[in-house]
């Protein structure tokens, strides 16, 4: 008779050294002695928090930026030198999408029924609750027009100064990368379906200039292209620069490598798509700049796309969760998978906590050795060694306690500073600072 599986441990080789009870965040980015947190929508209407982490055991909030627009959030932040960029993206994106569908649907139902449709009939077709219809109607009456990104002078971290707001389009900007010269922005733009890449010259941050665009074939509707996929399933999530290349996660379109040696003419030089059969979309694609195991490899990580209730979790049982991919990119024209790394539902007591998500979401977007610091929503932080890229091995983990009133953690993002200190944020309240000591 088999013994029962032991209860999963909440931590291995990782210790929490401090914590701040800050609102849930979409990103934590560390530069020097400061951590920059981009917050998810919250009751305080807080956009960005800057934390002094020069003493990791005694972190100190030095400034916060509140949003004047209650319909937007700024859940991403990056800093180069004294320049900080944060995104501006629509709250309740799903409701906004339904608002776009409402006029056409109402016309269709009116023609079919010979009368005005009821809220219940509209809700059934839109796939929302009847109680959501007033919010959909409100979103239709007041179209969102604050999508874009903001550039701040943070020379004085205690007093960030807004330099410029760059408007884009649609629901606005999601995740992005930047360096001293350019910002690599994932945003909706007129004439395209779903997010595309727009590269801006930010050397004069008071006047960013668009340099070029890149998109997946089929996204440019105004150019006569037609998508071969439903809705916005194929789109850019974001792209990370490495040398003269951008590594792009493209949702259900898989991953792409983009040559930007001519910044005004980005071109695709590599592609790999594992959808189907794997159901969760490609979130982040990152180059590993040094040979690993004698190969040039890159890492991709999925995002477990939706929070599910208990009934939906049961219906999906047996399907793969979002995971970490190791890809051989030695020949960009023939990208090959080497390995995947998954976390078992048995390895977290919160894996089936509902409503919620369990699978992968993100990793630390810089790799200095062979350790990959990954976030699993209800699985917390997972530290994975890829010294043998064909056999990734977990060497540490940390599962935080759930935020008050939440059934489980929803670990969202991670960064690691040059001292090896780990910074972890949740979609619910909580900012954990950790240290990893392998045994």
Question: How would you label these PLM feature ranges?
Answer:
Residues 1-439:
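Feature marking well-ordered beta-strand scaffolds used for ligand recognition
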């Amino acid at each position: 008779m088999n013994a029962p599986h032991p209860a999963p441990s909440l931590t291995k080789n990782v210790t929490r050294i401090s914590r701040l009870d800050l609102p849930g965040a979409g990103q934590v980015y560390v530069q020097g002695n400061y951590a920059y947190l981009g917050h998810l929508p919250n009751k305080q209407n807080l956009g960005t928090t800057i934390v002094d982490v020069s003493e990791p055991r005694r972190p100190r909030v030095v400034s916060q930026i509140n949003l004047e627009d209650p319909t937007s959030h700024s859940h991403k932040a990056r800093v180069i030198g004294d320049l900080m960029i944060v995104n501006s993206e629509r709250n309740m994106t799903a409701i906004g999408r339904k608002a776009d569908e409402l006029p056409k649907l109402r016309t269709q139902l009116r023609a079919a029924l010979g009368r005005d449709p009821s809220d219940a009939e509209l809700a059934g077709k839109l796939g929302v609750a009847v109680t959501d219809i007033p919010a959909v109607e409100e979103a239709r009456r007041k179209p969102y027009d604050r999508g874009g990104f903001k550039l701040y002078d943070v020379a004085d971290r205690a007093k960030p100064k807004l330099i410029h707001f760059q408007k884009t389009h649609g629901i606005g900007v999601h995740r992005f990368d930047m360096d001293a010269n350019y910002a690599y922005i994932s945003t909706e733009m007129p004439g395209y379906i779903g997010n595309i890449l727009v590269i801006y010259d930010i050397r004069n941050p008071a006047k960013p200039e668009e340099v070029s665009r890149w998109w997946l074939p089929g996204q440019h509707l105004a150019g006569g292209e037609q998508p071969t996929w439903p809705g916005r399933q194929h789109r850019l999530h974001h792209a990370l620069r490495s040398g003269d290349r951008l590594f792009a996660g493209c949702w259900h379109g898989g991953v792409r490598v983009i040559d930007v040696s001519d910044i005004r003419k980005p071109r695709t030089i590599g592609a790999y798509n594992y959808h189907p059969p794997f159901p969760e979309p490609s979130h982040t694609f990152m180059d590993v700049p040094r040979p690993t195991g004698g190969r040039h490899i890159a890492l991709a990580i999925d995002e477990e796309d939706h929070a599910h209730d208990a009934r939906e979790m049961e219906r999906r049982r047996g399907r793969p969760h979002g995971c970490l991919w190791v890809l051989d990119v030695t020949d960009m024209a023939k990208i090959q998978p080497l390995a995947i790394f998954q976390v078992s539902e048995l390895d977290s007591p919160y894996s089936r906590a509902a409503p919620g998500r369990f699978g992968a979401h993100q990793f630390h977007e810089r790799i200095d050795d062979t350790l990959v610091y990954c976030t699993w929503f209800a699985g917390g932080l997972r530290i994975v060694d890829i010294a043998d890229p064909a056999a990734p091995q977990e060497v540490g983990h940390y599962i935080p306690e759930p935020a008050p009133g939440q059934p489980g953690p929803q670990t969202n993002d991670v960064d690691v500073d040059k001292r090896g200190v780990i910074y972890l944020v949740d979609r619910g309240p909580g900012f954990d600072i950790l240290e990893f000591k392998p045994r």
